[in-house]
Structure formats: C-alpha cells, structure tokens
C-alpha cells in the first residue's frame, strides 16, 4: 500500500502544518499516510482489520483495531485527522466516540471525497467542533475546527435490529445490509440444503444472518464466522447469541487468521472497499479456499452477475456451476477435488 488516496493527497498539501502535531488518524484509512506523514507523533485507530494489518507493520502498537476507541488509543494526541467513510452512521459512531475522548481544544480535521458526503461533517459536528472548509482539491473537501465540547458517547445506542423469517439480526453502523437482508444473501440462502452437517465457514459474515439462517434448518453444522470489520464481528456475535446459535467469530482479512479446513465455505463477498470498487477480497477468497476445504468440500458464493468470478473459479477448482440466478445475482458452487488441489 503505497499509492495515496485523493483524500491523503489533499492532506499532503498541508503537510507543513502537521510537523509539530501529535496526530490521531481515524476513519476510512485506505493507505499508509498515517505511518509516513512527518509529525511529532502519530497514532491510528481503525475498525477495519485489513487497514490495521498494513498500518501496524509500520506503526506497531500505535495502530489500534477495535470497535470502540479507548482513552489509551488517543493518549497525548492534540490533533484528529478523520477520513470520512461512505457511510454516515458509521462516521457518527466513530466521531462521537473519538470526540468524547479527546480533550477540549483538540484540532479537528475531516477529509473525504465529495461523493462520500463529507459535507455533512459540518452539520454533524456543529455542536462540538464547528468546522470550516479549508481546502478543496482532487474532488475532496478538507474541513478544520477546534473541539469546543465533548459529546456523550454511548455505543449501545447505535445498535439496531430487524427480523428475517423469525430470526433476530443485530446490526451496527458500517455493517453490510444494516437495514434488512440483501437480495444476494436471500438468493444464497435459498440454495442451502436442510440437515447439512460438518464444519461451515462464513467469510465476510456481516451481521451473521447467513449463518443463523443456515443453522436453523441444519442445527448440526459447526459454525465459524469472520469479517474484516469490527462492527460486523460484534454484530455477528450478538446475532448468534440472540438466536441461541453457537459459533466462533473473529476478525480476519479473508483467510489471514483462519486455521484448519472446512466442509463448506459460504460467502457474499464484498466488492467495495470504502468508495473504491475492489475485487481483491473475492479473488483471494476463491483462490485461498482450496487451502481451507476438506476433500469433497464446497465453496458457495453469491455475486453480482457481471463480476468476472467464473474464470477465477475455473482456474482454481477446474470447474464451477451456477446453482441459482436472477437478473442481477448468481450463486456459484465449486467442489474441492484432486483437480482443484493442483490449482
């Protein structure tokens, strides 16, 4: 990760202003500017495990990954540089959390792409750190203000829930399909066979809805769930608990923290990383699945029909089949055979 995002390029136009600052970087940290900008001291807090992986290699313990930042994460910082995400409720959660910890008088910078809705930062922070726009370039806005009043932050107030066929789904800001079950997941669920047994891995688990729905009609499966997102990991744990389903849930960059092999891997893989379309995770999922499937095990994923997954599936497994499709989505199935092991 060396190329800077447009938001970071805008910040670099002001790099002289940051040389004496003790900076906390937070929000949608899609590059390694926090590790490379010349400052008096730098810390970073992220809810994205893959962003933490990159930053921690260069920043060590000064890069932190968690759902909620703590006093230790912001210690000694006099400046916040916040990268605005595409999701406004996610920004609200993170900013209220961070501003409740930082001392009054902290310099606050918010930067983001115009299409991500960064302008709404002004209204969001009006009562705490009134912002002014100080730069506009690369289709991004940079805003500056000073923290005048700490907000009260209560993470519990950000939880939401909805029901799907009698199942309770717990959600948090930034979790995929936060307001209801997406069409792709519905299609994938329709293909799952009742009374399935064995070890099942749900990659990119989101709020955990695929796993709890699968477990309801296949109670003998043993579930493992993972996601890069701290909100997703916590939401999945809560969804499992709310439905009395057991399973292991942890943060992982696709298979980075996954141990062992499974009889089935299911996923509705992401193809957006922040505002950037990215197929990397799905391709890593397909190619890496052969190292985590038992012989005869299967990978079953749902994806937008236009995405180029058939070629990667055939390269990796030797073949694939489409077991369900609509105009927009396809469910792909590939089986772990000797042919696949050579791939």
UniProtKB/Swiss-Prot annotation:
It is found in: Cytoplasm. GO terms for cellular component: cytoplasm. Keywords: Cytoplasm, Methyltransferase, rRNA processing, S-adenosyl-L-methionine, Transferase. InterPro entries: DNA_methylase_N6_adenine_CS, Mtase_sm_N, rRNA_ssu_MeTfrase_C, RsmC/RlmG, SAM-dependent_MTases_sf, Small_mtfrase_dom. Specifically methylates the guanine in position 1207 of 16S rRNA in the 30S particle. Monomer. Belongs to the methyltransferase superfamily. RsmC family. This is Ribosomal RNA small subunit methyltransferase C. It comes from Escherichia coli (strain 55989 / EAEC).
